[in-house]
């Protein structure tokens, strides 16, 4: 059998229904994670005593147990758990993006993904050169992933292979940009306004990184989580990337698009090009962010030149 791509993919599966009955049940979690468990990739799964046994059984059924590591760690032992009380206090005072499907505990799990990946980079049980994160509950109910059009089970392994293959494996942190945001929100004085509504910054549910770039960026994201939480804000992890996109500009490889085309566009723009141009490129141009605008243009032009999108598609060049 062909060996998996040289990348360890990481995810986490926790039952939060006991904290909030609007959160998914264990059964719902296991149904949504099923497509991910079928991927022939090195996989590390963090979870609890209520989720890991069933996940292990599914992975064994697919004969992928040998390339899987299960880490059973209860939520109370996670790095972010020390901030749970503060998160609850924050939400009592200021939570304009309130969503009954979430709770303080789900926020804690979500923001711990940075630490999950850093811990895995340090362990590196499969001795891979690269690492990636994928959210657990991306199943579409039809044995596919809802972050991809025309999904097939080889698209994730193909992405990981392309980013890690010799002789030119990536040395960057790869993530998809969702939109343009005003850089004034990097200023701590403007954080309250920033968090008055959900800002579309990046698609945080899937990223791939070389260890050096990833360690720097994920460590900084942990710092921003602490800073933002102590300031009284923070509802989800994607908005933490606003500072990181600038601070580590040359360490980040940006793909562009909406949530439904993350996998399609992760290597090059191929789907929903109207969104990439009108929602991302034009907004960068109108905001006066020239470098960001030119980078989107170059990616779109490359896709045209390589016949990945038709020449008549909306493009700024």
Predicted region positions:
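Short, aromatic/basic amphipathic alpha-helical patches
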Residues: 53-65, 84-86, 245
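Short internal beta-strands
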Residues: 44-48
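Active-site-proximal specificity loops/subdomain of glycosyltransferases
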Residues: 63-124
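Catalytic core and acceptor-binding pocket of nucleotide-sugar-dependent glycosyltransferases
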Residues: 140-144, 165-168, 173-183, 187-287, ...
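N-proximal low-complexity "stem/linker" segments adjacent to membrane-targeting elements
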Residues: 1-28
């Amino acid at each position: 059998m062909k060996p998996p791509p040289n990348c360890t993919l990481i995810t986490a599966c926790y039952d939060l229904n006991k904290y909030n009955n609007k959160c998914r049940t264990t059964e719902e979690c296991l149904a949504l994670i099923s497509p991910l468990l079928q991927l022939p990739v090195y996989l590390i799964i963090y979870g609890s005593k209520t989720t890991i046994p069933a996940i292990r059984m599914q992975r064994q059924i697919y004969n992928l147990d040998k390339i899987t590591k299960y880490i059973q760690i209860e939520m109370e032992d996670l790095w972010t758990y020390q901030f749970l009380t503060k998160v609850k206090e924050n939400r009592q005072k200021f939570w304009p993006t309130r969503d009954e499907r979430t709770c303080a505990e789900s926020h804690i799990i979500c923001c711990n993904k940075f630490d999950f990946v850093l811990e895995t980079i340090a362990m590196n049980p499969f001795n891979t050169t690269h690492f990636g994160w994928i959210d657990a509950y991306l199943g579409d109910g039809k044995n596919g992933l809802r972050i991809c059009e025309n999904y097939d089970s080889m698209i994730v392994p193909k992405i990981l292979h392309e980013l890690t293959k010799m002789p030119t494996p990536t040395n960057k942190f790869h993530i998809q940009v969702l939109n343009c945001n005003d850089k004034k929100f990097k200023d701590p004085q403007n954080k309250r306004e920033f968090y008055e509504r959900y800002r579309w910054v990046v698609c945080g549910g899937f990223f791939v990184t070389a260890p050096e770039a990833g360690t720097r960026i994920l460590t900084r994201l942990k710092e921003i989580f602490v800073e933002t939480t102590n300031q009284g804000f923070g509802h989800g992890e994607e908005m933490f990337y606003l500072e990181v996109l600038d601070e580590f500009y040359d360490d980040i490889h940006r793909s562009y698009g909406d949530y439904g085309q993350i996998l399609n566009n992760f290597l090059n723009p191929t789907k929903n090009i109207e969104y990439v141009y009108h929602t991302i490129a034009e907004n960068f141009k109108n905001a006066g962010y020239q470098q960001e605008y030119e980078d989107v243009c170059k990616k779109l032009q490359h896709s045209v030149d390589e016949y990945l999108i038709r020449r008549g598609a909306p493009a700024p060049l």
